[in-house]
Amino acid sequence: MMKKLTGKVAIVTGASSGIGRATALLFAQEGARVVVGARRQVELDSLVAQIKAAGGDAIALAGDVVSEVYAKALVELALQQYGRLDIAFNNAGILGEMGPSPEVSAQGFNDALQTNLTSAFLGAKYQLPVMAHQGGGSIIFTSTFVGYSFAFPGVAAYAASKAGLIGLTQALATEFGPQQVRVNAILPGAVDTPMYRQMNDSAEAQAYIANLHALKRVATPEELARSVLYLASDDSSFVTGTASLVDGGASISRS
């Protein structure tokens, strides 16, 4: 069977764990050459080794996604190493400061905005011109169902910063559509990642969150990776500007 991303080059941020790691592995399995980014060098090295052991091709660059220098460096590395850039999964994110909104610090709120929203813009700032020059490409952001179709108390910084990605998606999709660059966002429900376990650190909390979904469970990172693969591949060649719910029915479940 023909691999979906043969000949493509992809950047994946937030690749050290969770959805980002699963997506980088899947992209490589589907034939892409992958530039992986995150803060943690050890985890990135492990990921690259895993990809290469399976016959794939990847290179890592550790850094802070809120740095414009780092955003530019990831794109430059893709071009230097592989000569092109076709796909960017701007996935890095944090929960940010949680708690009653009047008690959230301005710095805590800004940290969430910087990591979840500004970093995505900075990535796209350098990815878009390359893709436009090549005649097309696909950019995917990781937003969330929280603050879109569902709300929780105590997560104002997270919800606001992730909701901003939907507006960014639509604006960039409109701006770069004529150059055949597609821009979409996925909106996961709860996914069994280190971030999820940090937010829900007891069996009772995890059972409560699972029950919010129509499927009565949370997703695996691999399930989300398959949705990202769809948006990255030519299977979605007429899809742009969307905020795609991949939430196990949380947006329709009221139980």
Language-model segment annotations:
Residues G99-S101, S105-L113, I209:
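Substrate-binding pocket helix/loop in short-chain dehydrogenase/reductase
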Residues V42, A62-L74, A106, E222-E223:
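The beta1-alpha1 cofactor-binding region of Rossmann-like NAD(H)/NADP(H)-dependent oxidoreductases
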Residues P129, Y148, T174-P178, S237:
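Alpha-helical segment proximal to the catalytic Tyr-Lys
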Residues L95-M98, L229, T240-S255:
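Short C-terminal tail/terminal secondary-structure segment
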Residues V9, S16-S17:
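Conserved glycine-rich cofactor-binding loop
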Residues P178, A185, A207-D235, V239, ...:
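C-terminal helical subdomain
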Residues A124, S161, T169:
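Active-site helix of classical SDR
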